[in-house]
Amino acid sequence: MTSLKLLKEKAPLVICITNDVVKNFTANGLVALGASPAMSEFPADLEDLLKYAGGLLINIGTLTDENWKLYQAALKIAEKYNVPAVLDPVACGAGEYRKKVADDLINNYKLAAIRGNAGEIASLVGIDVASKGVDSAGVDNIDEIALAANEKFNIPIVVTGEVDAIAVNGEVVTIHNGSAMMPKVIGTGCLLGAVVASFIGLEKGQELKSLETAMLVYNIAGEIAEKRPNGHLPGTFKAEFINALYEITDEDVKEFKRVK
């Protein structure tokens, strides 16, 4: 069974502790894809929900001291119930405090994967890359950045940009699909982190396969959305992207995938 069919069959509960700007978009995107999102932020509630969850997303976009404590509490509970956790270290290269939080979560808690743009992941491993907070484009060595992070942290890494790279156990693949409209809609990267959290726990020991499918489904849905009437306009693209996530099939992935 393909990872996409498995996701739709299991409809995994995905706990999304994400930034305030993208909660609605993230929830709707996951529902369209076939997952079951919950946007809980109360530790006692998380204790109950994570017992049944298939994934946890920690997105540090809306960073406060209280949220830092929440991330820590959620990761402790996730480890207790063996729930795979994905970290999205938003803008961790933009300042010392964000970097400190990201380092703490990576070094002191169990993560199943890290998803970030080239600038964010490069900052975690000490590689100098021009980055504007949550935006990073035109990076030539994205596969090297992914491998460096995979080697340093010994967990799967997803690095996004004009080309995306996935590194698992020293192996790297690059994804050459996607839409130029994605950076023009706030929250597309954050939703991707939640999609990664939806796929990462579907098949134990098959993380590379699951992550590759997650990236292809997401990026090809973007291509489909852009090709639809007025898909070149951000508002229309946003709606059509959700529609494409709902409609995308394994046949679409097989036909349009560009992987190296």
Swiss-Prot record:
* Catalytic reaction annotation: 5-(2-hydroxyethyl)-4-methylthiazole + ATP = 4-methyl-5-(2-phosphooxyethyl)-thiazole + ADP + H(+)
User: Which Gene3D superfamilies does the UniProt record give?
Assistant: 3.40.1190.20
- The highest taxon in the source lineage is Bacteria
Disulphide bridges, residue numbers: none
SUPFAM superfamilies reported in the protein's UniProt record: Ribokinase-like
* Amino acids binding substrate: M39, G187
EC primary class: transferase
Q: Where does ATP bind?
A: R115, T160
Pathway linked to the protein:
Cofactor biosynthesis; thiamine diphosphate biosynthesis; 4-methyl-5-(2-phosphoethyl)-thiazole from 5-(2-hydroxyethyl)-4-methylthiazole: step 1/1
Query: Keyword Kinase: yes or no?
Result: yes
Q: What is its EC number?
A: 2.7.1.50
CDD domains assigned to the protein according to its UniProt record, in alphabetical order: THZ_kinase
Q: Which UniProt keywords apply?
A: ATP-binding, Kinase, Magnesium, Metal-binding, Nucleotide-binding, Thiamine biosynthesis, Transferase
* Cofactor(s) the protein needs: Mg(2+)
Gene Ontology molecular function, alphabetical: ATP binding; hydroxyethylthiazole kinase activity; magnesium ion binding
- A Pfam match is HK
Q: Which GO terms describe its biological process?
A: thiamine biosynthetic process; thiamine diphosphate biosynthetic process
Q: Into which family does the record put it?
A: Belongs to the Thz kinase family.
* Its biological purpose: Catalyzes the phosphorylation of the hydroxyl group of 4-methyl-5-beta-hydroxyethylthiazole (THZ).
Know the name of this protein? Answer: Hydroxyethylthiazole kinase 1
Native organism: Streptococcus pneumoniae (strain Taiwan19F-14)
